[in-house]
Amino acid sequence: MAKKKGGATTRSGKKKVCVFCKENIEYVDYKDYNMLRRFTSERGKIRARRVTGLCPQHQRETARAIKRAREMALLPYIAGR
């Protein structure tokens, strides 16, 4: 069995702070599509917690709000080509 080259890479940098906790926002509103758009990729996918820097509670609420906004046709399911 051949050995793998390279070791485990470590992530460096500052830990991101949850935007909602920082601004004391308690409710993630599905109608605020400008805010929700910040947490989706250019392809329309929901970004991961390690990318957005949200806490677990607000990541769940944001994902739920994005899904509701998609149902109401405020956000696209996928981005146009």
UniProtKB/Swiss-Prot annotation:
Entry superkingdom: Bacteria
Keywords for the protein's UniProt record, in alphabetical order: Ribonucleoprotein, Ribosomal protein, RNA-binding, rRNA-binding
Entry coiled-coil feature ranges: none
Keyword Lipid biosynthesis: no
Matching SUPFAM superfamilies: Ribosomal protein S18
Molecular function via GO: small ribosomal subunit rRNA binding; structural constituent of ribosome
Alphabetical list of InterPro entries matching this protein: Ribosomal_bS18 (IPR001648), Ribosomal_bS18_sf (IPR036870)
GO biological process, one term: translation
Gene Ontology CC entries for this record: cytosolic small ribosomal subunit
Quaternary structure (record): Part of the 30S ribosomal subunit. Forms a tight heterodimer with protein bS6.
Family membership noted in the UniProt record: Belongs to the bacterial ribosomal protein bS18 family.
Primary role: Binds as a heterodimer with protein bS6 to the central domain of the 16S rRNA, where it helps stabilize the platform of the 30S subunit.
Protein name, UniProt field: Small ribosomal subunit protein bS18
Originating species: Rubrobacter xylanophilus (strain DSM 9941 / JCM 11954 / NBRC 16129 / PRD-1)
